[in-house]
């Protein structure tokens, strides 16, 4: 797919894309209780999660009703995913808790991602692995409900272990610091608490004391990270939008913090009663910010930094190298094509903002990364641009291009 973007001003009201992080967690919750997801958007990552719970005996009706099995067991000995790292990393400890032998594989983007920390951790508790990357054969059953794991590679392992300990009727996780992307661990804990489980997080230790979980019926709430690209598009193009279907921002730093971050950079950005109100200003200020607890915000912050008056620094970026693309290099490459300079330092990137009227009109490839395409599309709204392999947005938000059209973007899709 090729998307041609012409100078446009973004305006209107848009419903936030469903949170794939929350959708995947709710789908995995169906291992324990009935889950009814209304109007579920079938992004590639969500389809991976559905495929995974089916392999464990969950009955799925119309991709909306999820009924837990009477007994959890591995029904399929080979599980083929596409590209959902969240699904993969949460699934591994769940499989280990159920026990048996199973092989997992996925597309090339997941094959190149390391699984070192979860393999190292679970190898100490009765699990055998065929390698440290996909394709991966897992054999055995967890021999302990007290797990110790390093927290520096991915928080998704920790979230998966919380599910695993519910299978094992409770236990504890000791996380060896540093703890990266802590906000996503808190998201998982908040979800279990909401549905009746007792999960406590003290310092670096999580205690799980399962209770019977209540059923869930409803629509998946909006995703601040994905919604932030609509906000970025409005701010870059000189427009203004209202984004609906969003939960109230939490106190801890996470994807929802983008509302405050954009405000600190000089934008009109405010949350009120489930809506995010965004309006462009004539100029934006640079920012220095650590995104280690919410790395998916890197692209949107980089996008606004590109037209800020000065030098911005995004810190805590090391794990961006093991996303769908090497996002550190992707940011450098895409910004460079638009005429924006950047410099990578140890665990940070400097972005040298320019007047937006000086942005180029390049042809950019999405580099097999949905967030790269979304950042590039926002910058292209100023002076135009072309995005190739634009179907990559389907990984998280298959409606993205149609949503931009509804917000008055002038684009053509080939």
UniProtKB/Swiss-Prot annotation:
Assigned EC number: 2.5.1.19
Keyword annotations: Amino-acid biosynthesis, Aromatic amino acid biosynthesis, Cytoplasm, Transferase
Family, as annotated: Belongs to the EPSP synthase family.
Predominant localisation class: cytoplasm
One annotated GO biological process: amino acid biosynthetic process
Subunit architecture: Monomer.
Lineage, uppermost ranks: Archaea, Thermoproteota, Thermoprotei, Sulfolobales, Sulfolobaceae
Enzyme class name: transferase
UniProt GO MF annotations: 3-phosphoshikimate 1-carboxyvinyltransferase activity
Full protein name: 3-phosphoshikimate 1-carboxyvinyltransferase
UniProt GO cellular component terms: cytoplasm
Location within or outside the cell: Cytoplasm
Protein purpose: Catalyzes the transfer of the enolpyruvyl moiety of phosphoenolpyruvate (PEP) to the 5-hydroxyl of shikimate-3-phosphate (S3P) to produce enolpyruvyl shikimate-3-phosphate and inorganic phosphate.
Biological source species: Saccharolobus solfataricus (strain ATCC 35092 / DSM 1617 / JCM 11322 / P2) (Sulfolobus solfataricus)
């Amino acid at each position: 797919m090729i998307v041609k973007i012409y100078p446009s001003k973004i305006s209107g009201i848009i419903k936030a894309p469903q949170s794939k992080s929350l959708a995947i967690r709710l789908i995995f919750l169906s291992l324990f209780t009935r889950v009814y997801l209304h109007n579920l958007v079938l992004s590639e990552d969500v389809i991976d999660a559905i495929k995974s719970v089916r392999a464990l005996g969950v009955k799925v009706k119309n991709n909306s009703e999820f009924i837990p099995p009477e007994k959890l067991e591995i029904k399929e000995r080979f599980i083929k995913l596409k590209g959902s790292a969240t699904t993969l990393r949460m699934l591994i400890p769940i499989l280990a808790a159920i026990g048996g032998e199973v092989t997992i594989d996925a597309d090339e983007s997941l094959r190149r991602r390391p699984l070192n920390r979860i393999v190292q951790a679970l190898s100490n508790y009765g699990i055998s692995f065929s390698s440290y990357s996909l394709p991966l054969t897992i054999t055995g059953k967890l021999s302990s409900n007290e797990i110790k794991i390093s927290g520096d590679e991915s928080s998704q392992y920790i979230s998966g272990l919380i599910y695993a300990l519910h299978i094992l009727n409770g236990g504890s996780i000791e996380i060896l610091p540093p703890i990266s992307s802590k906000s996503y661990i808190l998201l998982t804990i908040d979800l279990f608490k909401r549905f009746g489980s007792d999960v406590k997080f003290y310092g670096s230790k999580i205690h799980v004391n399962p209770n019977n979980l209540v059923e869930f019926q409803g629509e998946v709430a909006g995703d601040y990270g994905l919604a932030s690209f609509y906000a970025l598009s409005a701010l870059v193009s000189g427009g203004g939008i209202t984004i609906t279907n969003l939960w109230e921002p939490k106190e801890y730093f996470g994807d929802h913090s983008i509302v405050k971050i954009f405000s600190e950079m000089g934008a009109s950005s405010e949350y009120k009663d489930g809506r995010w109100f965004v309006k462009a200003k004539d100029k934006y200020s640079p920012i220095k910010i650590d995104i280690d607890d919410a790395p998916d915000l890197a692209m949107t912050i980089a996008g606004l930094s590109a037209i800020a008056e000065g030098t911005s620094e995004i810190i805590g970026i090391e794990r961006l190298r093991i996303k769908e693309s090497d996002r550190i290099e992707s940011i450098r490459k895409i910004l460079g094509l638009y005429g924006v300079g950047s410099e990578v330092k140890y665990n940070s990137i400097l972005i040298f903002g320019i007047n937006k009227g000086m942005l180029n009109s390049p042809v950019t490839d999405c580099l097999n990364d949905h967030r790269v395409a979304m950042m590039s599309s926002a910058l292209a709204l100023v002076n135009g641009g072309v995005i190739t392999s634009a179907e990559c947005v389907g990984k998280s938000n298959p409606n993205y291009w149609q949503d931009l059209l509804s917000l008055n973007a002038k684009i053509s899709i080939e």
